[in-house]
Amino acid sequence: MTALRIIFLGTAELSCASLQALAGNPQFQIAAVVTQPDRPKGRDLKPQPSPVKSLALRLGLPVLQPERARDEKFIAGLRALQPDLIIVVAYGQILPPAILDLPRHGCLNIHPSLLPKYRGAAPIQWAVANGDTETGVTIMKMDAGLDTGPIVSQRRTPIRPEDDSATLHDRLAQLGAELLVQTIPDHVAGKIQPVPQPAKGASHAAKIKKEDGRIDWNQPAQTIWNRLRAFTPWPGAFTFLSKAMEGTASSVPSFAKSQGSDEALPSKMIKIWKAEVIEEVSGRDSALRRPDAAARRPHLGQKPGEILSADKTGIVVGCGQNALRILELQREGGRRLTAAEFLAGHSIKVGESFLV
């Protein structure tokens, strides 16, 4: 049987598992790998290859890096390769009709959500941030829209309490690769009839911005915890020390200013790596059981951002509903620490507050 000629388009780490799976399968021949041009990264801003380019070179595959996928010479080069199928996984550019119509079996895309939910740039993060308990991968036949093509196959996976965006990303990447290898033969043989995406349930997963990671202590603890998991490792869930806790003030990015105020906040940012939701006061939260605490806080977390207790078990912070126990955190310019390690070197007192 003649191997299927495939052109693979991908850039991000999410793409690598699929490229590896295709390259290691004798049913498929990778005619070319298309990825984004090398981009400046790191402190020295030296051009760095994409994860897909690095993998393709290790596999001995030809690599193309057009600045624009719409470039006519680039498209002519793809046409000359006579692909049977194009596979797209997190490539990063919208493909013109001239590419979509090029292979005889069309273009298949792997999207890390259960389409039509979470079309767009950041489906993994927003599924976690919104507290979803299930997500998955979708293989669709691409059309001119943004993640709107008919569904060829899907596979589901639970979002576990211990998941963050990094662990879920890796699981979905592997799940997508496995599903792709299983789907391609049936798709090419005409055994699968792609199903149009339903209009009901469609949503958009916007690109993550740095400011999305800032903690709003007015939100319920569960919401903050979900967002913490969603925005780990980037941009991270972060907050700022109050003036009383920091002692000095200086300018910070515009997105970090208090709502309704132009006053610059202290520059020392605290990144929270690990936390847990507290719904009831336990015996170990002794500071919460003081008589004055009951008088000041009729229910747990009445004052958002307030330090309710701080000991070796964690730093408990009041939220709009319930509270959050911080277990691991990192001060700007410092290293990641447990709460006990952090408190050994920083003075944080009950009654003080993080900035809301």
What are the functions of these language-model segments?
Residues 39-59:
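N-terminal beta-loop-helix "entrance" segment that forms/cooperates
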Residues 85-211:
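Donor/substrate-binding cores of folate-linked one-carbon enzymes
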Residues 25, 102, 231:
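Acidic-histidine catalytic/liganding microenvironments
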